[in-house]
Amino acid sequence: MVWAATTPTAANQPFNITNGDYTRWKLLWPKLAAFFDMEVGNVQTVKTQDIMADKEPVWAEIAEAHQLRKYAMSDIVTWPFLDYAFANGFDQMSSLTNIRQAGWTEVLDTEATVTDQLQKLRDNRIIP
């Protein structure tokens, strides 16, 4: 992070790094579904790493059908990390007081950031 490396007030400081807003997955799912022109499904309490373990051939078919770059699913997603991110039994609320006092002012809208990043992946033919 260039800002932390070049800002004297940031020297030797621990910071929480978040977008600056509070969001929940239940609020993001409709946006993600809309991005992919899909309906929102029901809540499932399964591990993605288990449910996706045998889906590499399905991804290969999707990639072929949409003329995507040839990436193995395992090259572009880490299922255990998604399981961690999806399975929090609590809201992630991190204080940005320390980083704000050091001079950081940027705030990102999580919904916009997620869809912007997905659009970049789509534009680069990594996802359909």
Predicted regions located by residue number:
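Mid/C-terminal beta-alpha module of Rossmann-like enzyme folds, strongest
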Residues: 1-82, 95, 118, 124
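A conserved mid-domain beta-alpha-beta active-site/ligand-binding segment of alpha/beta enzyme cores
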Residues: 85-86
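Glycine/small-residue-rich pyrophosphate-binding loop that anchors the diphosphate of NDP-sugar donors
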Residues: 90
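C-terminal/domain-terminus segments
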Residues: 100-128
